[in-house]
C-alpha cells in the first residue's frame, strides 16, 4: 500500500505537476524511465523476498540490504530528475506544491539511509548497527516520518496542485501554504517518540514526542482548512463534479487523522489506545481515506 501504490502515485504526480508548474519538460527523461523500472523492480523483489522470510524485521523498513541499496539508487535518480526539472524551469517562482514534493524527497532519503545502516552477514541477512532503545528510537524516527513525509508531505504536494486545478480556483491563502510547509517540515521530524510511550525510551524523549505532536495539530489543520477553503466560490461544483467530492472527502480524512494523531500522542490517552484497533483505524483513515481518495481523484482528473 505505502511503497507500491503510494510510491508509484508520488512518482507519477510529482513528475506530472512539476512540468506544468515549471513550464518545462522533465529533466533527463531516460533517468525518469529508470526511476519507473527501478521502482517496479523494488516492488517485485519485495513481493518475492518478504513471503520467503527474508526481512530485517523493521516496520516499514523490512527489506534486506541489497534491496535497500536499489531503493537508494532509484531515489537519487528521482531527486536528479525532479530537482533538475526545477533548475531548468521557465518560471521565476517555485510553486508551493513543488516545495512539498522536494521536502518529501530529501527527508525520505535521509530517513532511509540512517535507519537502514546495517552489517550484512550474507546476501539475504543483515543486522542493524543500532541496538536496544537506540534501535527503537531510530526505527520510529523513521517509521513516523515515513508516514509523515511519504504519505503526508508528498501527498500535500499533490493536493496543492490538483485541488486548485479541479476547483478552477487559486489556493485560498498562498501565505498559509508556505507557513504550512515550513511548520510541517520543522515539527514533524520530532514527533516519532510518541510511538514508544511507556517503553525503555527515556521519559524526556517520550514527552518531547508528545509535545511536538500536539503542536503539529496547528499546521496540519492549517493545510486542511487551506485545501477546503480553496473551494470558496466553487462549492456549487460539488453537486455535479464527483472528482471534487472525492478531493474534499480526502481532505476531511486528512483533518480527522491529523486530529487523532496528536490526541493519541497524549500519554494518558495512549495508555488506553495503544495496542487497540483504534491505532489501526487511525492509520487506515490516513492511508485509505486521505491517500487513496486523493490519488484516485487525481488519476480520474487526468
Summary of predicted features, one role per range:
Residues 1, 61-69, 133-148, 207-213, ...:
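Short aromatic-rich membrane-water interface segments that cap or initiate transmembrane helices
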Residues 2-92, 120-126, 191-212:
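Membrane-interface helix-loop-helix modules in multi-pass inner-membrane proteins
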Residues 295-302:
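Conserved small/polar residues in nucleotide/adenosyl-binding loops
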Residues 17-24, 83-92, 159-169, 226-236:
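Cytoplasmic membrane-interface regions of multi-pass membrane proteins
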Residues 24-39, 95-101, 170-183, 239-248:
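Membrane-interfacial loop-to-transmembrane alpha-helix junctions, especially the N-terminal start
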Amino acid at each position: 500500500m505505502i511503497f507500491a501504490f503510494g510510491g508509484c502515485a508520488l512518482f507519477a504526480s510529482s513528475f506530472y505537476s512539476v512540468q506544468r508548474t515549471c513550464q518545462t519538460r522533465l529533466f533527463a527523461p531516460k533517468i525518469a524511465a529508470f526511476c519507473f523500472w527501478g521502482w517496479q523492480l523494488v516492488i517485485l523483489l519485495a513481493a518475492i523476498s518478504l513471503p520467503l522470510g527474508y526481512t530485517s524485521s523493521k516496520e516499514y523498513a523490512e527489506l534486506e540490504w541489497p534491496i535497500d541499496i536499489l531503493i537508494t539508487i532509484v531515489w537519487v535518480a528521482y531527486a536528479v530528475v525532479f530537482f533538475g526539472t526545477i533548475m531548468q524551469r521557465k518560471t521565476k517562482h517555485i510553486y508551493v506544491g513543488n516545495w512539498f514534493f522536494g521536502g518529501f524527497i530529501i527527508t525520505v532519503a535521509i530517513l532511509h539511509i540512517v535507519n537502514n545502516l546495517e552489517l550484512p552477514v550474507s546476501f539475504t541477512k543483515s543486522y542493524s548497527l543500532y541496538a536496544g532503545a537506540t534501535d527503537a528510537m531510530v526505527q520510529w524516527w523513521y517509521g513516523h516520518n515515513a508516514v509523515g513525509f511519504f504519505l503526508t508531505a508528498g501527498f500535500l504536494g499533490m493536493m496543492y496542485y490538483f485541488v486548485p486545478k479541479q476547483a478552477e480556483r487559486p489556493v485560498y491563502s498562498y501565505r498559509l501554504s508556505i507557513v504550512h510547509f515550513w511548520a510541517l517540515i520543522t515539527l514533524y521530524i520530532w514527533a516519532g517518540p510518541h510511538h514508544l510511550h511507556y517503553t525503555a525510551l527515556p521519559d524526556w524523549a517520550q514527552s518531547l514526542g508528545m509535545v511536538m505532536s500536539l503542536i503539529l495539530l496547528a499546521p496540519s489543520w492549517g493545510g486542511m482548512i487551506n485545501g477546503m477553503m480553496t473551494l470558496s466560490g466553487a462549492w456549487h461544483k460539488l453537486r455535479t463534479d464527483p472528482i471534487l467530492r472525492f478531493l474534499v472527502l480526502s481532505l476531511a480524512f486528512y483533518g480527522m487523522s491529523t486530529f487523532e494523531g496528536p490526541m493519541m500522542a497524549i500519554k494518558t490517552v495512549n495508555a488506553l489506545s495503544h495496542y487497540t484497533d483504534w491505532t489501526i483505524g487511525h492509520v487506515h483513515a490516513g492511508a485509505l481515506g486521505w491517500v487513496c481518495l486523493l490519488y484516485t481523484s487525481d488519476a480520474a482528473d487526468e
